[in-house]
Amino acid sequence: MEVDSIAPQPQEKIEEIESADLVVAILADLDSESLAAVCNDLQTLEGSPRLAVLQNEKSGAAAHAHAETAEKSTFPFLISRPLLRPDPAGTPALSMFAAYQSVFAAGEKLGARACCVVASKLDNAPPRWICQMAKPMLEKEIDLVLPRYAPHKFEGLMNSSIISPVTRSLYGKRIHNPMGPDLGVSQRLYRKMLGAERNPRLNGIHALASLASAALCANSQVYEVNLGARVYPPTDWANISSLMAQILSPFFLDMERNAVFWQRMRGSVPLPTIGDPVPVPQDTGTLEISRMVEMFQLGNRDLQEIWGLVLPPATLFELRKLSRVPVEEFHMPDELWARIIYDFALAHRLHMITRDHLLKSMTPLYLAWVASYALELEKEKGSGIEQRLERLSAAYESCKSYLVSRWRWPDRFNP
């Protein structure tokens, strides 16, 4: 981030934000009414902290409208600047990671005690939720505040099936959304992220993939805040392989860096939570289950050479049996799925093949888990979703000894 050009605003407006206690970045595409509501809420924070609100500026006509909104705003702390860069290479996850580093750099420039990021639109969000996220860092010196969204059945499944349960198993805290994306970060933690980015020995680190683990490994305090249901962008199932590689590679790298810490952890405990649970929305989404099962069957036929490098014989045998099951009876056991993820994390560490190729080869296995999960939840309500994901997380914990054994003795432990 070019800190000397922190906002394309008139000089008098820049001078008003030479320093701030709290930097809030608006990455979500909020309308003027929603943006005003966020700004109004922030002004009610106890102690009247100095504010800097960075609104993501879009290109073309949208950029002009955003800049005009910021300039005419009655909020002197609202500025408009490009935070999310265009993504011609088709790497949305990496673009998002870079945006957070830019926000943290702005926080460092302004000497902010904390940074918050509003990356999502929310359904039925609690009043003043942005204040609930900011207050713990300003008043209690909490280092990380993460969202707990009201769950959708078929949204955020990469987080629900991999990121969240693996984080819980590794670090012993029941974090529902380790990568946010709506979150609050203390000065101590965002400076740590910036320092890691500048360290050439930590190549590949990304803020969203490492925030939760960095806080937990430092024994910092982490809170969750109950939010409404997140409005997710449509899932691009045609390009899910690329997205998996973009998200899981930095996640697995971070897992490797922290191995000394997480190998000692056993069990898990819940996090302190702010606010009351938000009612679960009606969920009418559907998935093409038959198509997902077909993709798994094709993968089982065509990817045996790669899977054979990663997965032990017992797992390959179970997958071959699963590939012959009719769609209506299709079921992937949670323990099998957890062991598969752990095996791919180990293969990523050992560079068995190019990492991008390795992670993309996971796609048929991921689709198999999604199909199995969708079949179970076709008629479930909100409570069923959370209970189902709790069983999955418990399976990851029960299989952690498998991970530790394979991690320590990858050549000897091959059941």
Model-derived segments and their meaning:
Residues 179, 204-205, 389:
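Conserved phosphate/pyrophosphate-binding and hydrolysis machinery centered on Walker-type P-loop NTPases
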Residues 116, 202-204, 222-226:
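Short hydrophobic alpha-helical runs that function as membrane-insertion/retention elements
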Residues 2-168, 188, 192-195, 209-217, ...:
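Structured catalytic core of nucleotide-sugar glycosyltransferases
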Residues 149-156, 169-184, 201:
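A recurrent flexible, glycine/aromatic-enriched loop bordering the glycosyltransferase active site
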Residues 177, 219-230:
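Catalytic beta-strand/loop signature of glycosyltransferases that borders the donor
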Residues 196-202:
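Conserved nucleotide-sugar donor-binding catalytic segment
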Residues 145, 227-231, 317-321:
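Short acidic (Asp/Glu) and glycine-rich catalytic loops that position anionic groups and cofactors
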Residues 1-2, 20, 67-69, 249-415:
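Terminal low-complexity segments of carbohydrate-biosynthetic enzymes
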